[in-house]
């Protein structure tokens, strides 16, 4: 009947069983669920647990006189008979001394230590129960399959189940709530669980019975933990003996997650501004607990890998009356309550269902993985449903949850419509927007109407059928009197002079040279310019296009050089800037740069 513990090389991707080897009447393929602490435990014989309370509440733990938990956080401080002392702790405060930890934890040592606190230093089972890591009561009771016919199961507790009466007699109904919610197979509580209820009342773990507790905390310091009633309507479990020194880090770390009603304004029951959603109190409590479960799944992912189930796995036909009067267990402002598993499945859906039943396909053969116990094992709790029944119930609960969410949306819709209408009535419409256009179309303001839409011409008193021009009598649309007509005026006789005679070349021949140059430079693009240029050509002048000057050969002097392209000699030039003639000697004159005689217009 004595179990043997063998070491295994485990990997992160393919993790075998948690290291518990059983012989004789042990469970076939008994394993922890994926959110258990995968500690390697050896078998504790019957002789090691009879007649002793097993574990004390404070200051070191002794089993059969030997200290099992010491205040040393870096090694094995003492030994528990039946637990092999060869498995030391793997890191700083990351595991319970005397318990071998599977390599799946890896780097989880500091993470568990920071979240849970100094569990090893105080050696207090109450801390490990409430914090959800280390050696917890769910790990001893539910995860280790303590029932009457367990034989040599994970913990050898034949007969009257002395470990239940000895080790777990200092528990409370609050712990039973955790045991029921975190049982791996999710079935109803066995007879030993029911018997343990009477034994759990001797200590009252969460009801502040420990009188010599030097805790620095008080329940008045945490009003959020004591003000909200439990989801099942039972009495509220106080912080109690959770006020241990070892819980100081986890309370300080998690008190910031205190959930208040105003954090979820869209939920029923919230009163803010003009909003008041109507819903019965039972639905409010259910929805609040579902929200807490979602927060736990998001912010406390350590619980799935450290051996503590935050919301409870799916159960097929667990009796509800066994859990309705167990108050919720709170730690640092976040409630690990016995949430209704129907609502939990409806909110978390495939995630919880997959983690609860993912190992049904793995039970046939191959290396056993971390998952659920098989349905045909001898240690399975009675009353568990088949896989098809679980599927059917899950779909039924999911449908109820969707119908409940639809009711919530229909309850909130009339309020949204009313609030939208009230907001639109309070805010003044934009005069330049679509709402402002309505006042223009309705023509409430006459000035604005005439500016935007114009004025009806028939209202101005105009004769639209008249053949004459209307502008003679129409003064203005804002004028009440018609216009007086065109004003009377007379044109002077000088404006009626006769057309001057056309230009004649004979007239230009009579002008002097200065007059001709004046007409040419002062009347550009005029017929007089052409006539003046023609008269200058008649008098022996020629126009240079490049220099824009008039040239003439000196009389009685021939050019020094004369070719078809150019000629060089002495020339007389008229400078319009100085208005005089100048003499240029030895000047080269290109023939192509000379302007030809202009063509006079014919009248």
UniProtKB/Swiss-Prot annotation:
Disruption phenotype: Impaired stable genetic transformation by Agrobacterium T-DNA.
Gene Ontology terms: cellular component: CCR4-NOT core complex; nucleus
Compartment(s): Nucleus
InterPro entries: CCR4-NOT_su2/3/5_C_sf (IPR038635), Not2/3/5 (IPR040168), NOT2/3/5_C (IPR007282)
Region Disordered, annotated ranges: 1-70, 212-242, 306-335, 355-377
Keywords for this protein: Crown gall tumor, Nucleus, Transcription, Transcription regulation
GO BP, sorted A to Z: DNA integration; regulation of DNA-templated transcription
Polar residues bias: start-end ranges: 1-28, 36-70, 312-335
Predominant cellular place of this UniProt entry's protein: nucleus
Up-regulation conditions: Upon infection with a T-DNA transfer-competent Agrobacterium strain.
Family: Belongs to the CNOT2/3/5 family.
PANTHER family attached to this UniProt entry: CCR4 NOT-RELATED
Self-association and partners: Binds to VIP1. Interacts with Agrobacterium tumefaciens VirE2. Forms a complex made of Agrobacterium VirE2, VIP1, VIP2 and single-stranded DNA (ssDNA).
Function: Transcriptional regulator required for Agrobacterium-mediated stable genetic transformation by T-DNA integration in host genome, but not for T-DNA transient expression.
Protein name: Probable NOT transcription complex subunit VIP2
Organism expressing this protein natively: Nicotiana benthamiana
């Amino acid at each position: 009947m004595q179990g043997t513990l063998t070491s295994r090389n485990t990997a992160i991707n393919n993790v075998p069983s948690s290291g518990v080897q059983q012989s004789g009447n042990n469970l076939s393929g008994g394993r922890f669920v994926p959110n258990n602490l995968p500690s390697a435990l050896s078998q504790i014989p019957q002789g090691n647990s009879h007649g002793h309370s097993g574990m004390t509440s404070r200051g070191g733990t002794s089993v059969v006189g030997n200290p099992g938990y010491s205040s040393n956080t870096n090694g094995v401080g003492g030994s528990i008979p039946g637990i092999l002392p060869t498995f030391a702790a793997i890191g700083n405060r990351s595991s319970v001394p005397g318990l071998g930890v599977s390599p799946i934890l890896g780097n989880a040592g500091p993470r568990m230590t920071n979240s849970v606190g100094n569990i090893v230093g105080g050696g207090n089972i109450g801390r490990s129960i409430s914090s959800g890591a280390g050696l917890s009561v769910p790990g001893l009771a539910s995860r280790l399959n303590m029932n009457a016919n367990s034989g040599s199961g994970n913990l050898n507790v034949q007969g009257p189940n002395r470990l239940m009466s000895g080790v777990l007699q200092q528990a409370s109904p609050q712990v039973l709530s955790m045991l029921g919610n975190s049982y791996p197979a999710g079935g109803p509580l066995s007879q030993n669980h029911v018997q343990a209820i009477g034994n759990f009342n001797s200590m009252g773990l969460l009801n502040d019975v420990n009188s010599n507790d030097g805790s620095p905390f008080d329940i008045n310091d945490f009003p959020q933990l004591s003000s909200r009633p439990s989801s099942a309507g039972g009495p509220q479990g106080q912080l109690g003996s959770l006020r241990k020194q070892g819980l100081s880090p986890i309370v300080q770390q998690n008190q910031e997650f205190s959930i208040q009603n105003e954090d979820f304004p869209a939920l029923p029951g919230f009163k803010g501004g003009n909003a008041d959603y109507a819903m019965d109190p039972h639905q409010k409590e259910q929805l609040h607990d579902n929200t807490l479960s979602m927060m736990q799944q998001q912010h406390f992912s350590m619980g799935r890998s450290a051996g503590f189930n935050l919301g409870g796995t799916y159960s097929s036909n667990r009796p509800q009356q066994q859990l309705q009067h167990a108050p919720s267990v709170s730690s640092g402002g976040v409630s690990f309550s016995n949430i209704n598993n129907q609502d939990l499945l409806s909110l978390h859906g495939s995630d919880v269902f997959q983690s609860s039943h993912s190992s049904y396909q793995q039970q046939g053969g191959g290396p056993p993985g971390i998952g659920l116990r098989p349905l045909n094992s001898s240690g399975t709790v009675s009353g568990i449903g088949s896989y098809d029944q679980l599927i059917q119930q899950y779909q039924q609960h999911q449908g109820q949850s969707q119908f409940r969410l639809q009711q919530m949306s229909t309850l909130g819709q009339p309020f949204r419509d009313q609030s939208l209408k009230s907001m639109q009535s309070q805010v003044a419409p934009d005069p330049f927007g679509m709402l402002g256009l309505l006042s223009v179309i309705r023509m409430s303001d006459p000035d604005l109407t005439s500016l935007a839409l114009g004025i009806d011409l028939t209202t101005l008193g105009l004769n639209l059928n008249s053949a004459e021009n209307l502008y003679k009598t129409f003064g203005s649309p804002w004028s009440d009197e018609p216009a007086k007509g065109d004003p009377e005026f007379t044109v002077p006789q000088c404006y009626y002079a006769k057309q001057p005679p056309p230009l004649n070349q004979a007239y230009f021949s009579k002008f002097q040279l200065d007059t001709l140059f004046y007409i040419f430079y002062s009347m550009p693009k005029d017929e007089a310019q052409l006539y003046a240029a023609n008269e200058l050509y008649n008098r022996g002048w020629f126009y240079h296009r490049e220099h824009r000057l008039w040239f003439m050969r000196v009389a009685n002097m021939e050019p020094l050089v004369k070719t078809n392209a150019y000629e060089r000699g002495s020339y007389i030039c008229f400078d319009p800037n100085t208005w005089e003639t100048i003499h240029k000697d030895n000047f080269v004159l290109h023939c192509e740069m000379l302007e030809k005689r202009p063509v006079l217009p014919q009248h």
